[in-house]
């Protein structure tokens, strides 16, 4: 997955952006339960730091920031109150590790960022977009495949999997997303708009699964164009349902789209 480096790319500065809650979550469920002498659960902290050090060793970035979700309604909840409504609450053993990892990161002088009304994905998207525009390379570390829509030639999405305490990482530039999913990172949003997402409780269009959604988007490029040719869609049920549930498809696309122009108070120097 390493990109061939030419002279110019060697000169590009790099930032690593870590989706804090997502990686803690992955670590929590991937590392057996550990507690310290005071009875604090530490497995997520341990697993998170393992992933962090592995990434830093591989990426050697000039900048690093960890984003966190704020426990508050986001603009998506305001638009669709049922958004993420099926999520189970965070396990108490994991919840108690969140403030501790923030303290650990602070002690290590690692910048963290969170903002009410936005999800970590929006912070990742906005910061990665602005860093790429500055001519930097970006590595986003997240367990959430929604972030694949952010992949470009210079933004790499790294999805860690921890099994038996060992971490393996899947890497995606834009070309890798296309290779694995058959669509570009931007089209990935439209596939999700059609098929929905049970994890985030995004409704999508009834009766359209991943296969049909992918086929439609490969052929038509986006939901708007598919809707213009709705009578031609196969199978007939997909055609009928996209027409009938069009508003739901549009809503789903908005919910699934990461904001890359959010108002984020980010100062690159603090991430150095």
Describe each PLM feature range.
Residues 1-10:
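Short, Lys/Arg-enriched N-terminal segments with co-localized hydrophobic residues
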Residues 11-65, 69, 75-80:
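Non-catalytic, usually N-terminal nucleic-acid engagement modules in DNA/RNA processing proteins
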